[in-house]
C-alpha cells in the first residue's frame, strides 16, 4: 500500500526552491499541489503557460512510488522528461520511436522501481508488455495524470480510441496491488467547456474530484477574424499580415498536410524562409523543424494541429489560422501559444465569405467534417450488430480490423462498458449518438460570425460568466 507523504508545507516549498529555484507557488499552484499530495481526484483547467507541469511533477517527486503521466504527443513527453533529467530527477518515457535498447533500459528501471515519473501515451500504457510490468504487485503506483485531457474529448471518438479505455485503468491496477493501495487521478487541460469537463470526469470515473478552473482570458492576445473573398485573396491577406511584421516569430495553422506543403511552397516562392510541419514527417524531420523554430533559424512554421503542444516559446508575436479549426477548444489551445511573455500578440483567423459562392473551401470542409462524423456512427452501429456482446479488444480487432474506433463510439453512445482496459460488454445494440463534436463545430462557426466581443464569447463558451457590459477592448469587434 502507499506510504503517506509526511513532509510539512515548508518542506514542499523547500523542494520547489531546490528543484526549480522558485521561492513560492503561483496561484493556484499551491492548492493543486496540496490536492495531489492528499491523493484526491482532480480536474484542472489551467491556461497554457500557467505552470501546470510543476503541479503534478512536484507531488510525484515527493513520493516514494511511481506516478504515470499519460500524454498525447512524443514531443510533449520528450520536452518535459528532458527538463526533469537536467534537474537530475528520476523520470523516463516510453513511446514507439525509442530504440530497442532505450525501451529496455526504461522497462528495467521501471521493474527496479527506480522511477518517480513515467511518461507514456494511452496506447503504450495499454500495450501488453508495459501493462504486465505495471500490474506487478510490488510496483507502487501513486497516481495517474492525464496531461492535455481535452484530447480525450477531441480524439477519443476518432483516431485515438485508447483514450476511451482509460477509465478502466485504475480499477484494474488496484486489483493487482496490495489491499489499501490508493491511486488518484488528475486530469489537466488548458481548455474544457462544461460539456467536455463532464465527459472527462465520466470517462475517467473521477471520484468526487476537486475542480480548479482558471479563467483563460489573456489581455495581451488580440483576436481578429477577416473574410477572404477568394482563395487568392486569402493568400494575399496572409502575405500582407506577415509583411507588416518583419522579424517577428509566428505560427500559421492549416487543416491538412497538403495545405501545409502547398502554402509553404507558395511562401517560399514569395521569399520567406519557412517549413511545413505535419504528422506525416519522420520523427527526425519534426525535431529538426522544432529546433530550427525554437532556435530562431526560421521565424514561422506552416503547421497542422500536430505542432505546438508542449513546445514552449515565449516570444511568439502572432498566430494565423489560415483555415479555422473545427473546434473552439483547438482554437483556444493554438492562440494560447502566442504572447506567453506577456507582451502583445496578434491572432488572426481567415474565413471564406458566408455564402461560399466565391470561395467554397470552408463550407466544403465543414460539410466533410459533419459527413465523416455521421459515417463513423453508421459504421459503428453496423459493427455493433456483428460484434460479440462480450469480447477482448485485441481478439476483436484481428477479426474486425477497424473496430477500435467503433468500440470507442459505442462507449461514447452509452452502448458499451469497459469491464477492464481490454474487455468490453455491449449492453445495448442501439444508442443515441452524442452530438459533442458537431455541437462544438457549430459553436466555432458562431464564434467566427459573432458581432459581440470575441473574448466575451470565448469566456461564456467555456463556462465563465461575464457582466453584460464587459468588453475586452482589444479584439476586432471591440475596435482594436
What kind of region is each of these model predictions?
Residues 135-143, 150-213:
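Post-DEXD/H (motif II) to motif III coupling segment of the RecA-like Helicase ATP-binding lobe
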Residues 222-266:
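Conserved interdomain hinge at the start of the Helicase C-terminal
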Residues 38-44, 65-66, 114-116, 183-184, ...:
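Pre-Walker A (Motif I) flank of P-loop NTPase domains
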Residues 68-69, 74-120, 273-276:
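Conserved nucleic-acid-binding Ia/Ib motif block in the N-terminal RecA-like helicase ATPase lobe
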Residues 249-253, 257-259, 265-282, 286, ...:
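C-terminal helicase lobe
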Residues 38-58, 70-71:
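Walker A/P-loop
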Residues 99-143, 153-157:
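Conserved helix/coil segment N-terminal to the catalytic DExD/H
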Residues 2-45:
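Conserved pre-motif I regulatory segment
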Amino acid at each position: 500500500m502507499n506510504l503517506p507523504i509526511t513532509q510539512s508545507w515548508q518542506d514542499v516549498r523547500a523542494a520547489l526552491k531546490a528543484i526549480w529555484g522558485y521561492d513560492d507557488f503561483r496561484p493556484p499552484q499551491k492548492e493543486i499541489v496540496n490536492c495531489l499530495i492528499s491523493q484526491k481526484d482532480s480536474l484542472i483547467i489551467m491556461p497554457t503557460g500557467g505552470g501546470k507541469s510543476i503541479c503534478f511533477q512536484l507531488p510525484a517527486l515527493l513520493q516514494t512510488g511511481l506516478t504515470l503521466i499519460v500524454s498525447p504527443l512524443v514531443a510533449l513527453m520528450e520536452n518535459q522528461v528532458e527538463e526533469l533529467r537536467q534537474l537530475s530527477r528520476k523520470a523516463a518515457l516510453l513511446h514507439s520511436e525509442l530504440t530497442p535498447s532505450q525501451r529496455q533500459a526504461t522497462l528495467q528501471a521501471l521493474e527496479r522501481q527506480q522511477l518517480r515519473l513515467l511518461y507514456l501515451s494511452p496506447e503504450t500504457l495499454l500495450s501488453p508488455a508495459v501493462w504486465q510490468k505495471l500490474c506487478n504487485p510490488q510496483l507502487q503506483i501513486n497516481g495517474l495524470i492525464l496531461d492535455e485531457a481535452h484530447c480525450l474529448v477531441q480524439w477519443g471518438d476518432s483516431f485515438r480510441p485508447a483514450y476511451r479505455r482509460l477509465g478502466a485503468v485504475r480499477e484494474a491496477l488496484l486489483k493487482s496491488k496490495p489491499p489499501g493501495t490508493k491511486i488518484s487521478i488528475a486530469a489537466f487541460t488548458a481548455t474544457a467547456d462544461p460539456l467536455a469537463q463532464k465527459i472527462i470526469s465520466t470517462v475517467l470515473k473521477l471520484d468526487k474530484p476537486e475542480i480548479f478552473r482558471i479563467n483563460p482570458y489573456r489581455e495581451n492576445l488580440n483576436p481578429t477574424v477577416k473574410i477572404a473573398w477568394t482563395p487568392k485573396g486569402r493568400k494575399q491577406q496572409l502575405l500582407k499580415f506577415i509583411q507588416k511584421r518583419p522579424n517577428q516569430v509566428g505560427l500559421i495553422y492549416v487543416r491538412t498536410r497538403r495545405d501545409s506543403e502547398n502554402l509553404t511552397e507558395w511562401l517560399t516562392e514569395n521569399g520567406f524562409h519557412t517549413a511545413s510541419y505535419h504528422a506525416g514527417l519522420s520523427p527526425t524531420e519534426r525535431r529538426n523543424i522544432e529546433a530550427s523554430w525554437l532556435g530562431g533559424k526560421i521565424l514561422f512554421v506552416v503547421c497542422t494541429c500536430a505542432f505546438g503542444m508542449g513546445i514552449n516559446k515565449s516570444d511568439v508575436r502572432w498566430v494565423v489560422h489560415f483555415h479555422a479549426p473545427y473546434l473552439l477548444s483547438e482554437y483556444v489551445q493554438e492562440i494560447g501559444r502566442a504572447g506567453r511573455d506577456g507582451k502583445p500578440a496578434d491572432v488572426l483567423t481567415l474565413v471564406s465569405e458566408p455564402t461560399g459562392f466565391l470561395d467554397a473551401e470552408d463550407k466544403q470542409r465543414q460539410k466533410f467534417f459533419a459527413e465523416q462524423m455521421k459515417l463513423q456512427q453508421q459504421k459503428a452501429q453496423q459493427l455493433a450488430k456483428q460484434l460479440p456482446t462480450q469480447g477482448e479488444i485485441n481478439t476483436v480487432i484481428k477479426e474486425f480490423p477497424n473496430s477500435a474506433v467503433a468500440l470507442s463510439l459505442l462507449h461514447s453512445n452509452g452502448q458499451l462498458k469497459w469491464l477492464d482496459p481490454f474487455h468490453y460488454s455491449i449492453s445495448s445494440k442501439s444508442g443515441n449518438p452524442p452530438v459533442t463534436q458537431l455541437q462544438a463545430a457549430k459553436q466555432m462557426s458562431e464564434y467566427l460570425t459573432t458581432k459581440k466581443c470575441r473574448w466575451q464569447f470565448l469566456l461564456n463558451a467555456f463556462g465563465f460568466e461575464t457582466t453584460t457590459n464587459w468588453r475586452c477592448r482589444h479584439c476586432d469587434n471591440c475596435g482594436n
